[in-house]
Amino acid sequence: MKVKIELSGGLELLFDKKKVHEIEFSDKNEIPLKDLILYMRDNLLKERSELFVVDDTVRPGILVLINDADWELFGGISYNVEDKDTIIFISTLHGG
Amino acid sequence: MKVKIELSGGLELLFDKKKVHEIEFSDKNEIPLKDLILYMRDNLLKERSELFVVDDTVRPGILVLINDADWELFGGISYNVEDKDTIIFISTLHGG
Amino acid sequence: MEKYIKEHTLKPNEIERYGRQLITPDIGVSGQMSLCNSSVLIIGAGGLGCPVALYLSSAGIGTLGLVDYDTVEISNLHRQIGHRESSKGISKAVSLSKTISELNSLIKVNTYETTFTSETAMEIIKNYDIVVDASDNVATRYLVNDACVLTGKPLVSGSALKWEGQITCYNYNNGPCYRCIFPTPPPVETVTKCSDGGVLGPIVGVIGSLQALEVIKILTNNKEGVLSGRLLIYDGMSAVFRTVRIRGKQSGCNVCGDKPTVTQLIDYTQFCQSNYSESAGK
Amino acid sequence: MEKYIKEHTLKPNEIERYGRQLITPDIGVSGQMSLCNSSVLIIGAGGLGCPVALYLSSAGIGTLGLVDYDTVEISNLHRQIGHRESSKGISKAVSLSKTISELNSLIKVNTYETTFTSETAMEIIKNYDIVVDASDNVATRYLVNDACVLTGKPLVSGSALKWEGQITCYNYNNGPCYRCIFPTPPPVETVTKCSDGGVLGPIVGVIGSLQALEVIKILTNNKEGVLSGRLLIYDGMSAVFRTVRIRGKQSGCNVCGDKPTVTQLIDYTQFCQSNYSESAGK
Ligand SMILES: [Zn+2]
Ligand SMILES: [Zn+2]
C-alpha cells in the first residue's frame, strides 16, 4: 500500500523541510493511523519528536486531514489508513 | 456514463445560473467533447447560444478544462469525454 | 439573485459611493443596507487588521471597532499597509482609524487603545454584530473565541506566518467554535511568532481580504458560501489553496457544548502559558 | 532555504524596515537586495492596482511605475483602497503615488498620467523589469501582453468581476503568453465590465495581493512556485480556489511563437473592437 503524507504550517521543518512524503508499506493493505504516526516519528523525524507526537498521538495544535477532511469525521486516531489515502498534518498558525 | 460540468466566470448565467450540472448518458460509454458542447447548447442553454458556441466550438475567450487541465493538453475539441470526467468552462475575466 | 427593494434608506451619497458594489449579484440594495447598518469589531490593527479594516470601511460597514494596544513601528510597514511613516510611535488603532476615515468619512470608527483581555473583552464586544480575529497570539485567539461564544457573535478568524495563511469562521449558524477544533492550546515551544519566523505582506493581504469577504457574506446573509465548518489553507509559495472540511460543533466542547465548563472568561495567559501580545513575549 | 550573505548593500534603515520580511525563508538578505534593486510597472491604478502597489511599495521594490489616465471618483472608493476622498478628481496614478510615498519614502515612484497605447507602451515599459496587468479591458490586456513579449518582460496578469477572480503569469521562464491561451479576442458582447456587473473590494484585494506575491517570487528567483503554466481561479462566494494546468508556450503563437506575425505593436482597439478604457466604452 502507498500513503501520501503532506505537511504544512511549519511542520515540514521537522521532516527535512519536505512538504510531501510518499510511503510504501509493501507488506500491508492497511495500517492504523496511530501506527503511521509512530512510524513517522521513528523513521522520518529525527529530533524533537515532542513537537509532533505527545502521548502517542499528534500534539495539540495539529489538525489531521484524511483525504481533505478532518480526521474527527473518520474516528480520529483509530482510523485505519488505506491504500492511496492522503494524510495531511497541519500546524495551526497564530500570527497576523 | 456520467459527466460533471462546471461553469464559471459568468458562463453560469447562460445556464440557469447553475454552476454545476451533472449529465448522464445511459446509452453511451464515451462522447466526443464536440457533441457534448452541442448537447449543452441545444439542451441546457435556451437562448443566446452565440455567447457559448461559435462555429461548432466554444467561442473565443472561454477556457475549457478537462479534469482540471487545459483541454489543449488532451487534443482540444477532438477529446472523447469519458465516464466521471469533469469538464469546466471558464469565461476569462477582464475587469480590475 | 439580485434583490431590489423599492423602499430603501440609502442616501444619495451612499448610492453614488456603493453603486458598483450594490449592483453585484447577491448584494443588492438590501445587502448594502445591511452593511451600512452593521457593526464589526476587529481585534488587531496589524498585518491582517489593515486589509480587513480597509476593505470593510470602503464597503460601508456602518461602525467599525479597532482594538490594538501597540504603537506603529517602521518594522511593521512592510506588511501593515493601513499605517503611514508619519504614524510612527502612535497607537495602531488610532493610526488605522485615521487612514480609513480618509477613505470613507461616512462610517463611524471606534478605537480601543487597550489590550483585549478577560477584563476588557465583554464590555467592548457587546456593541458589535460580528468579530474579526486579526490578532497575533494564541492566548488572544482563545479569549476572542470564548467571548464570541458567550455573547453569541460570529467570529471570522484568520492567521498567517511566513508564506502561509489559514482562515475559517467560528460560531456561525450552529457551526463549530475554535475550541471545538482545538480543545487544548498548543505547547508553547511549538508556536512560531511572526517576529521570529517572518511574514510577507501579500500573505496577510490575501488572508485579510478573505476575512473581509466572509464578513460581507455573513452580513448580506449569503449563508451557503460562508466558510463555516470548512478551513481554507493557503500556501503562497506554491500558489495553492485548499478548502477542507472540518468537524462540526462538538457537543462535548468546553465552551459551546451541551455542558460547558467555561461559562465566563478565564485567564487565557495562564491557560495558554503565554501572553496576550506577541511583542510582550520577546 | 534562507540565504545569508556577508557583503550586502542594505542600509540600516532598510534592515530596520524590511527585517521581518528578509528573515522569511526563501527571501533572505539577497532576496531583499533583489527587491530593492528592481523596478515594476503597474498598468492600472484601480481595484487591482491599489493592493498591488501598496504591497509592492511596502515590500521595498526600488522603483514602481504607475500608469493610469483616469481620475479618482467617489464611486471607485468602495474597492480602490489606495485612494482617498480628498483625491477626488485628480489622477489615479498621482493619488496612488501619494499614498505609497507616505507608506514608504525609501522607494521611487514614477507616474504616467496617460493611456497605455501602442504609441506610449514601448517607451514606458523599457525602463522596468516586470509588468503587472491590473487593467480593466480586453484591448489593454492584448497590448500589454504583446509589449511584454516584444521586450522580454514577465507579465503578472490578474482580473476580477463580481465575486470572481483569475491570476496567472505570462511570458515567464519560457512559459505561455496571453495569446498562447487566448489567440482570438472574445466577441465584444460577451465581455462584462465592472461598471456593469459590479465587483467587490475584497475580490480585487485577494487577486491584487496574489499578484504582488508573484512579483516577489519572480524577483527573488523562487522559480518553482511561480504561477506560470498554471491559472488560479477564485470563486469568492463559495470560498473555493482552483489551480489548474494550462497549455505551455505555443510554437504557433502569433506573437511569441516560432514565426510570429506580430513583430511590433498593432492597433488593439481595432483588433479587439473595443476601447483601451472601460469608462470610454460606456
Ligand atoms: Zn466549541
Ligand atoms: Zn504566445
Curated annotation (Swiss-Prot), chains A, B:
Pathway: tRNA modification; 5-methoxycarbonylmethyl-2-thiouridine-tRNA biosynthesis. The modification 1-thioglycine is found at G96. GO terms for molecular function: protein tag activity. Coiled coil: none annotated. SUPFAM superfamilies: MoaD/ThiS. CDD domains: Ubl_Urm1. It is found in: Cytoplasm. There is a cross-link at G96 (Glycyl lysine isopeptide (Gly-Lys) (interchain with K-? in acceptor proteins)). InterPro entries: Beta-grasp_dom_sf (IPR012675), Mopterin_synth/thiamin_S_b (IPR016155), Urm1 (IPR015221). The keyword Cytoplasm applies. Keywords: Cytoplasm, Isopeptide bond, tRNA processing, Ubl conjugation pathway. C-terminal thiocarboxylation occurs in 2 steps, it is first acyl-adenylated (-COAMP) via the hesA/moeB/thiF part of the MOCS3 homolog, then thiocarboxylated (-COSH) via the rhodanese domain of the MOCS3 homolog. Pfam families: Urm1 (PF09138). GO terms for cellular component: cytosol; nucleus. GO terms for biological process: protein urmylation; tRNA thio-modification; tRNA wobble uridine modification. Belongs to the URM1 family. Acts as a sulfur carrier required for 2-thiolation of mcm(5)S(2)U at tRNA wobble positions of cytosolic tRNA(Lys), tRNA(Glu) and tRNA(Gln). Serves as sulfur donor in tRNA 2-thiolation reaction by being thiocarboxylated (-COSH) at its C-terminus by the MOCS3 homolog. The sulfur is then transferred to tRNA to form 2-thiolation of mcm(5)S(2)U. Also acts as a ubiquitin-like protein (UBL) that is covalently conjugated via an isopeptide bond to lysine residues of target proteins. This is Ubiquitin-related modifier 1 homolog. The lineage of its organism: Eukaryota, Amoebozoa, Evosea, Eumycetozoa, Dictyostelia. The gene is urm1.
